[in-house]
């Protein structure tokens, strides 16, 4: 099968299976299928059996499975979940960290939402904002188009991303097994800025976490080039 060949022929360390944790189930109206017509758990149950079979009989030791998005009914079957499709608008739709508040100690996520795809838009503020939010909510920083990121216009943004990824490496004892408690807005010198696609927010963002041993940790990110 495909999972076997990817591991044995190519030697991958992880396998990404698109859509499973993202796509909503479609109703089935076939009366001969043995489930309630137009309902039932066949979609969810079928995927769980499929992924369970892969994990039990095909996935090699120290390999991981990932999928798109973070449907609750599959989080125990995947080692990481890519979160990028959350809708957002400046005025009408604000992303709130409900999922990490509930599942941060039981699910590993990657990314936050789609990042800019053009070099001249990398420095408008939303790129840094998305990376900062990913870090604060415990998500692995990533899902970034390398072409605009490595352009001359994005040198400072690339440096900002490298700083956050290096910093996150020191937080493994917090974000893996720890619990996201809340977002914070630090008081004092903390100017409000307009983030394209997200609206107004503070330049310095923060979050409170609780480590597995019960200790509190505060993560603070300054998105500005200036000190605050």
Language-model-derived ranges and their functions:
Residues 43-228:
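Active-site-proximal substrate-binding groove within the catalytic cores of carbohydrate-active enzymes
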Residues 2-77:
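Active-site neighborhood of glycoside hydrolase catalytic domains
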